[in-house]
Amino acid sequence: MFRRPKGTRDFLPEDMKFRRHIEKTIRKVFESYSYEEILTPTFEYFDLIAEKSGEEIRRSVYVFEDKGGRTLALRPEMTAPIARVIANELRSRPKPLRLYYITNVFRYEEPQRGRWREFWHAGVELVGSSRVESDVEVISLGCEVLETLGFKYYVKLGDVSEIRNVLSEIGVTDEKEQNLILSMIDRGGDYSSYLESKGFDPRALNELFSTREVNTEKIRQVLNLMEDKFSDRVIVDLKLSRGLDYYTGLVFEFYVEGLDVAVGGGGRYDK
C-alpha cells in the first residue's frame, strides 16, 4: 500500500465542498475591494527565491535541478513570484496594482498542527502606494474575510521600521545583523544578551517594548483610520516582526479563537 508523502493531505469530497466554500467567500471579499486574480508557475528559478524571500523561508525551500542543469524551487510563498511578474509583465500598468491569489505553496517544515509541507495560501498584494490607507485597506480586508466566515478573531499589529530605527540609534546599522535580531525578537529569543555580547546597549529597545502607549505614528494612524467594527480587534505588539527579512514598516498577524498560531499575516515591504 502506498502512503501519501509526509506533510501532505488528501481532500475527500466533503472536504472539497468546505474548501470551495471558503475559497468562494475569500474571492468575493477580495474582488469587492477591486483585487484581480493572478497565478504564477508552481516552480521558479531558485535565484529568485534566494534573493527575494526571507532567510526563514529560504531554509525550507524544496530545491531540485532540471535536466538542463538549472536550479529550480517549488514556490514557498507568492510574494517573490508576484514581484517577478510585476517587474517583467506589469511594470507599465497604472499604480496602485491590486492583485490576489489562492494557490498551493510548498515548504519543507516539520509537520505539526497548522503546519504542512504543501498548503493553500490566499493573499493580496497592493503595489505602488506608500499611503498608510493602503496598509489599513489590506488589514481591513483580512478582517472582513474572517468576519464573513464567522470566526472570532483578533489582529496583532507591529511596526518593524520602529525596531530598525532603534537598532540603528544604538549602533546596529548592518541590515543582516538587524534581520538576525528581528528574528530573535520574533521567536522570543534573548536579544538583550546578544546585543550586550556584541557591545550594544539594549536599554532603548527594551524601553520601546515595555511602553504601554501606542508610540509610533503609523500605528496611531492605522487605529484612527480603521472602521469601528475592526479597530477594536487590534492588539498592538511592538515585538511583532514576522521573522521575514523583507518587511520594512507595519506588520500584522490574524489569530482566531481556538488556535495558538496565526492563520494569516503580512506587512509593508518597500524594497
Predicted regions and their residues:
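Auxiliary tRNA-acceptor-end handling modules of aminoacyl-tRNA synthetases
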Residues: 1-16
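Charged, compositionally biased N-terminal leader segments and the immediate start
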Residues: 1-3, 154, 172
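Positively charged, Gly/Ser-enriched RNA/tRNA-binding surfaces
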Residues: 15-33, 44-45, 64, 68, ...
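Polyanion/phosphate-binding surface patch
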Residues: 42-72
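Acidic, His- and aromatic-enriched active-site or binding-groove loops in soluble protein domains
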Residues: 60-66, 172-195
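Short, conserved phosphate-binding/catalytic loop or strand-edge motifs used
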Residues: 118-122, 157-165
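Short glycine/threonine-rich loop-to-helix capping motif typified by GTGT followed
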Residues: 166-173, 246-252
